[in-house]
């Protein structure tokens, strides 16, 4: 194929690091093709004074990138897979899922504060997070001791707010910190016992036009089958629950050497008091079926009632989450 391939990317530092990595991998595999990056801002990048859950749009960080592909201004887009809705616009497809970085959540403690992690923070310490999933699980474990506030902005902005003393700690994805070369700032990596990660967290999703066979062929070099199986199970579970990126749904997956896939899922109330849990194992070559089965188990365990209550709460004026307030 003799032409230039245009890659769409958000314009944040992390997004560009990820997109440049994808571009370089594609260039290495296809040296006869030219790959160019086009940067753009999404709605989620522009609205910084409202909690993500209050905006209530499942395509906050993807719609502009998708429009560019549908209008044939770009050929593909690079997403943090956790930001990509499970229902894609007609005509678009998830063409590749890259090898996953550590999907865990990370705690970054403010410099000068002697604490190895959340358990060591003084009573009343303020922890920043923009994720209802993290908030609900952390309130379950630390709600009696710690205070939680919303925090918005890219990773650079959040770390600056932390260092300015507006928070005592913040919770981010390990993957983002590592990709930006900031691993030394991580104070604690949260275990699945404390915080199940977001669907797709740690992996990149490469989206393209479904009918563009040439681009789909190019993307095969980026696809990592073990990661893809895990993430497709997670996304199938999320899709069956009709949840978006901004609801307290957490997952944890394992794929053993025999190809058997295990999926653990959780749906939590905003105050962390009620949790529906489910776990199943199945053949790794049927990840979507496993995801749907775990979703049904979660519904049987009370997940639907929890989600229904959350959808009412986050749409109510002035309500973000119990115990959480916008960071000033």
UniProtKB/Swiss-Prot annotation:
Task: Give the GO cellular component terms, alphabetically.
Answer: cytoplasm
Q: Name one GO biological process term.
A: heme biosynthetic process
EC number in record: 2.5.1.61
Keyword line: Chlorophyll biosynthesis, Porphyrin biosynthesis, Transferase
- Pfam families, A to Z: Porphobil_deam (PF01379), Porphobil_deamC (PF03900)
Q: Which InterPro entries match?
A: HemC, Porphobilin_deaminase_cofac_BS, Porphobilin_deaminase_N, Porphobilinogen_deaminase_C, Porphobilinogen_deaminase_C_sf
Which cofactors are named for this entry?
dipyrromethane
> Which pathway does the database say it acts in?
Porphyrin-containing compound metabolism; protoporphyrin-IX biosynthesis; coproporphyrinogen-III from 5-aminolevulinate: step 2/4; Porphyrin-containing compound metabolism; chlorophyll biosynthesis
**Record's catalysed reaction(s):** 4 porphobilinogen + H2O = hydroxymethylbilane + 4 NH4(+)
Record's cofactor remark:
Binds 1 dipyrromethane group covalently.
Positions where S-(dipyrrolylmethanemethyl)cysteine occurs in the chain: 245
CDD domains for the chain = PBP2_HuPBGD_like
- Entry-linked NCBIfam families: hemC (TIGR00212)
Purpose of the protein: Tetrapolymerization of the monopyrrole PBG into the hydroxymethylbilane pre-uroporphyrinogen in several discrete steps.
- Additional free-text comment from the UniProt record: The porphobilinogen subunits are added to the dipyrromethane group.
* Protein name as annotated: Porphobilinogen deaminase
At the highest ranks, the source species' classification is: Bacteria, Bacillati, Cyanobacteriota, Cyanophyceae, Gloeobacterales
Gene name of the record: hemC
């Amino acid at each position: 194929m003799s032409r230039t391939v245009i890659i769409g990317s958000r314009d944040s530092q992390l997004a560009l690091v990820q997109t440049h990595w994808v571009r370089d991998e594609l260039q290495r595999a296809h040296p006869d093709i030219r790959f160019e990056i086009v940067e753009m801002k999404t709605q989620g990048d522009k609205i910084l004074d409202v909690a993500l859950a209050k905006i209530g749009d499942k395509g906050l960080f993807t719609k502009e990138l998708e429009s560019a592909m549908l209008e044939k201004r770009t050929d593909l887009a690079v997403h943090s897979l956790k930001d990509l809705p499970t229902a894609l616009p007609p005509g678009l497809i998830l063409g590749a899922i890259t090898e996953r970085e550590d999907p865990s959540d990370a705690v970054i403690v403010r410099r000068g504060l002697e604490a190895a992690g959340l358990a060591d923070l003084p009573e009343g310490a303020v922890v920043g997070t923009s994720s209802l999933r993290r908030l609900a699980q952390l309130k379950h474990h630390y709600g009696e001791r710690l205070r939680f506030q919303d925090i918005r902005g890219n990773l650079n902005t959040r770390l600056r707010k932390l260092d300015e003393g507006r928070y005592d700690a913040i919770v981010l994805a390990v993957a983002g910190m590592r990709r930006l070369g900031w691993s030394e700032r991580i104070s604690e990596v949260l275990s699945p016992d404390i915080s199940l990660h977001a669907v797709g967290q740690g992996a990149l999703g490469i989206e393209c036009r479904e009918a563009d066979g040439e681009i789909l062929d190019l993307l095969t070099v980026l696809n990592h089958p073990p990661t893809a199986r895990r993430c497709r199970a997670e996304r199938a579970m999320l899709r069956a629950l009709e949840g978006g990126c901004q609801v307290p749904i957490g997952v944890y997956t394992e794929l053993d050497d025999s190809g058997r896939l295990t999926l653990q899922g959780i749906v939590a109330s905003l105050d962390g008091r009620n949790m529906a849990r489910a776990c199943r194992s199945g053949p790794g070559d049927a990840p979507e079926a496993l995801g749907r089965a775990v979703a049904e188990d979660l519904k049987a365990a009370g997940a639907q009632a929890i989600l229904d209550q959350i959808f009412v709460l986050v749409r109510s004026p002035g309500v973000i989450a119990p115990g959480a307030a916008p960071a000033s």
